[in-house]
């Protein structure tokens, strides 16, 4: 800022005269100008920062502009860039880059008391030792110019991978059933031994049609307690990421097709490029691939 001010006035008043009225010494000004003319004369940190800034900005933009300093740093490490986390945080602040902040209410559609007979087989233990051991499901709403639309997800707990999803104009049973069918198609019903499907007690998930489809695929149903979001915490966590990283970043959504396209793009990024701390800061697809490679080698 000071250097730019001197630059603007020095032909008229001279450097020494201007610096006499500003908190900058003439020697400091001339040193800065020499470094501008010859970048090799800059301090090592300044030179390093100049190289890192575009790299950090590239990673942030490639990762859907949602990563904070921690995830940007982790991605840089995966890319072979050696840099301290505090440096990434400092340069992101200089560049005006920041991660998105989660927040927002959830949709709740509780079912009649008759569904209390369906057990909670998970008991808040959202962990799995292999793919297709535990799936969790949930859905949320999105306000658009054409009215509310709804997005449902089926997530494989092992790698946090989204294996099924659906965007619809209504939240009837068909809507969540379509997400389940997509998951079954992708995973294949022949490779689902002892699979548990967990959800909240929403009317869609405990309906006769949904329960029948689970039974036909040999999947054991599990539901959390009424009104307790912690009983489906992992699914709600993914919903929270979706609302933060996709929906909340736009002021206005036009309609179903608009949301559907954005969701398609996000799910692909989520599964194949987004880093997850609980699985070692790798994408879900990579984590699953490692499992199958190790299983084959054994």
Task: Please provide the spans of the model-predicted regions.
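Charged DNA-binding/catalytic regions of mobile-element recombinases
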Residues: 1-298
């Amino acid at each position: 800022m000071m250097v730019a001010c001197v630059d603007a006035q020095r032909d008229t008043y001279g450097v020494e005269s201007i610096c006499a009225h500003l908190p900058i010494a003439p020697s400091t000004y001339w040193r800065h100008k020499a470094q501008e003319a010859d970048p090799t004369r800059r301090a090592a940190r300044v030179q390093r920062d100049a190289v890192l800034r575009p790299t950090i900005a590239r990673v942030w933009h490639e990762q859907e502009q949602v990563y904070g300093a921690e995830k940007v740093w982790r991605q840089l490490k995966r890319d072979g860039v050696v840099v301290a986390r505090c440096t990434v945080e400092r340069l992101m602040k200089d560049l005006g880059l920041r991660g998105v902040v989660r927040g927002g209410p959830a949709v709740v559609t509780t079912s009649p008391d008759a569904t209390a007979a369906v057990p909670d087989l998970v008991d808040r233990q959202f962990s799995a030792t292999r793919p297709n051991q535990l799936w969790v499901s949930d859905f949320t709403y999105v306000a658009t110019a054409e009215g509310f639309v709804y997005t449902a997800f089926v997530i494989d707990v092992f790698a946090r991978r989204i294996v099924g999803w659906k965007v619809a104009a209504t939240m009837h049973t068909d809507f969540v059933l379509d997400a389940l069918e997509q998951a079954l198609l992708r995973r294949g019903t022949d490779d689902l031994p002892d699979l548990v499907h967990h959800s909240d007690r929403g009317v869609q998930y405990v309906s006769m049609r949904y329960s029948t489809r689970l039974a036909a695929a040999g999947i054991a149903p599990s539901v959390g307690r009424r009104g307790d979001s912690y009983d489906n915490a992992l699914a709600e966590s993914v919903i929270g990421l979706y609302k933060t990283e996709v929906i909340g970043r736009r002021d206005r959504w036009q309609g179903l097709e608009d949301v559907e396209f954005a969701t398609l793009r996000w799910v692909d990024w989520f599964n194949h490029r987004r880093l997850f701390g609980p699985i070692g800061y790798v994408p879900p697809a990579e984590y699953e691939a490692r499992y199958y490679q190790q299983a084959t080698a054994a």
